[in-house]
Curated annotation (Swiss-Prot):
It comes from Pyrococcus furiosus (strain ATCC 43587 / DSM 3638 / JCM 8422 / Vc1). GO terms for molecular function: 4 iron, 4 sulfur cluster binding; catalytic activity; metal ion binding. Belongs to the radical SAM superfamily. [4Fe-4S] cluster binds at C12, C16, C19. Gene3D superfamilies: Aldolase class I. This is Tungsten-containing aldehyde ferredoxin oxidoreductase cofactor-modifying protein.
């Protein structure tokens, strides 16, 4: 295991329509602190572990002991990454993140922070998030370590795709290190009309402009904007495990919760899938279990069908859920837009002495 993702809470202070959280069937909750400490104890058994990452489908800063958790991770010597909308981070918290040497913070922002830029699907309060980024840049300069690295996650829709180059320039001038661009994964039939990877939009000019901006020092990670044959599971390739707030160990974000998604307009039920609970077993026992090891072997070698471009997909019952595919794999990754790099996995890369 090289990356361990912790969903320390599934609650959030915002209500963004494109978020899984608005459409899943699961209950909300916070990871209790004793369980968190047990997970850190278990994590110390993995010598190749590069980073612990506070993420999942919740807002980590909502957790009442968020800063205690940050301090504990850094006290134990782990690298720490955090995904956040940033709106609850106070000046004191931002300053302490820099002083503690938190390694990476990714903020969510989908448009330029101007009054006229209001999107119906994207993350709201872009102006507030931008101010938090400015302050974090200031505090890390005062500390003098250039930590944390700062990234921004952007979800592309028909509402904001034309703004991507301008947003990239803005982030570069703001002092941001990385920009992760991902496509919208529709969670309602209406959202299908907002995707840009169905051939309705020519993204080539936008992509070319973004590459030019990247040469100026902004690390930009882009998705594909059309369906391609190649499949790459970043969660599996980077040896990632994800632990839900209640202790369930899942292989990736896609299987973290139960919800409905729309693959090029076709409805699919995604059912959460766990390989065990760290309340009952050690993380090492779960990670090395026969079932989890076999799953990683299957996904690593892509020994599963491709439902997305199968000619039988509209007449097949297997594609209706992620429970099983026509090759007998449980759960099924055969319809995953994350492995197609249409939806981007938020896995950091270690480049030039820092995580991005």
């Amino acid at each position: 295991m090289k990356y361990l993702y912790l969903e320390i809470t599934s609650r959030c202070n915002l209500r963004c329509e494109m978020c899984f959280k608005q459409h899943w069937e699961d209950e909300e909750g916070d990871m209790d602190y004793d369980l968190f400490l047990k997970i850190l104890d278990d994590a110390e058994k993995f010598p190749e572990l590069k980073m612990i990452y506070f993420g999942g489908i919740g807002e980590p800063t909502v957790h009442p002991r968020f800063m205690d958790m940050v301090r504990e991770v850094k006290k134990r010597g782990f690298a720490l990454g955090i995904s956040t909308n940033g709106t609850l981070l106070t000046d004191e918290m931002l300053k302490e993140l820099a002083e503690l040497g938190v390694d990476l913070v990714y903020f969510s922002m989908d448009v330029l922070p101007t009054a006229q830029n209001v999107v119906t699907l994207g993350h709201i309060l872009a102006g507030v998030t931008a101010e938090k980024i400015k302050k974090l840049v200031k505090y890390r300069e005062e500390v003098g370590t250039h930590k944390p690295s700062i990234g921004v996650e952007v979800v592309v829709t028909k509402e904001n795709y034309k703004q991507l180059p301008e947003l990239a320039r803005y982030l570069l001038n703001l002092g941001v290190d990385a920009m992760l661009v991902s496509n919208l994964l529709p969670l309602t039939p209406e959202q299908v009309n907002d995707i840009v990877y169905d051939g309705s939009i020519d993204m080539t000019p936008i992509v070319n402009e973004l590459y030019k901006i990247a040469h100026n020092g902004l690390y930009i990670k882009l998705p594909y904007f059309e369906l391609k044959t190649e499949r790459v599971c970043d969660f599996d390739e980077n040896k990632v495990a994800v632990i839900r707030w209640d202790g369930e160990v899942v292989p990736c974000y896609r299987f973290l919760h139960t919800y409905r998604e729309y693959i090029f307009g076709r409805e699919k039920k995604v059912n959460t899938y766990s390989f065990g609970n760290v309340r009952e077993k050690s993380l090492a026992d779960i990670w090395t279990s026969e079932r989890y090891t076999w799953f990683r072997f299957i996904t690593k070698n892509y020994l599963y069908p491709s439902c997305t471009d199968c000619s039988l997909r509209d007449a097949c019952d297997f594609v209706k859920t992620t429970d099983i595919d026509c090759w007998g794999n449980e759960p099924s990754c055969a319809d995953c837009l994350w492995s197609r790099r249409i939806v981007m996995c938020p896995i950091p890369q270690y480049n030039f002495g820092k995580f991005l």
